[in-house]
């Protein structure tokens, strides 16, 4: 695909991969990409700067696993970076309450500018570290239906210590991963590193190995 970047080409690309996108949603997704590339000239938001590659490596990779996620409640996107997957998921699933957690101040500033321009209700930026929930989550806060991680490596403590503090009973902890992660999980699996309840695979165009989504469910 070597077409002029536009909301129309973005929409055609996603529609061609089975993701229904309205013209208004395509405009918002395109603005996300456009502003990210503009800010990337002075801030390190992404190493991927070609429009075609962004469509695959950021947008499509964010949206294809949506079919396996509970996106009707309150969702936390950990280490969201430039807003992937949280912002695209929120645009296509407006019913979810999306919270974007990011520790980098420049990326937090970018996200605030992006969300102000999109005027998208029900999406919030949290400045903090996943490992320090006391800085962004209190016992009075409503727990999350889903915690999602696309660019953060899952550690045992994420599942045994942190997830129970912020996930509601029956909630889902989801991690995006490349094909090599399955072996790593098998090698490190202990009682403190439980097996995923589900493993889902999907393919991205131009990539030889499948991507995977690992899902853990919080005990009720």
Curated annotation (Swiss-Prot):
Q: Any idea which GO molecular function terms this record carries?
A: rRNA (guanine-N7-)-methyltransferase activity
Q: Where in the cell is it found?
A: Cytoplasm
Kindly list the positions annotated as binding S-adenosyl-L-methionine.
79, 84, 150
Regarding protein family, the annotation reads:
Belongs to the methyltransferase superfamily. RNA methyltransferase RsmG family.
Q: Which organism is it from?
A: Syntrophobacter fumaroxidans (strain DSM 10017 / MPOB)
**Broad class of where this protein is predominantly found:** cytoplasm
Q: What does this protein do?
A: Specifically methylates the N7 position of guanine in position 527 of 16S rRNA.
Which catalysed reactions does the entry list for this protein? guanosine(527) in 16S rRNA + S-adenosyl-L-methionine = N(7)-methylguanosine(527) in 16S rRNA + S-adenosyl-L-homocysteine
Task: Identify the GO cellular component terms for this protein.
Answer: cytosol
Highest rank taxon of the organism: Bacteria
The record's section on NCBIfam families has: rsmG_gidB
InterPro entries, A to Z: rRNA_ssu_MeTfrase_G, SAM-dependent_MTases_sf
Name recorded for this polypeptide: Ribosomal RNA small subunit methyltransferase G 1
Q: What is its EC number?
A: 2.1.1.170
EC class of the enzyme, as a word? transferase
Instruction: Answer yes or no on keyword ATP-binding.
Output: no
Its keywords, alphabetically, are:
Cytoplasm, Methyltransferase, rRNA processing, S-adenosyl-L-methionine, Transferase
Say yes or no: keyword rRNA-binding present. no
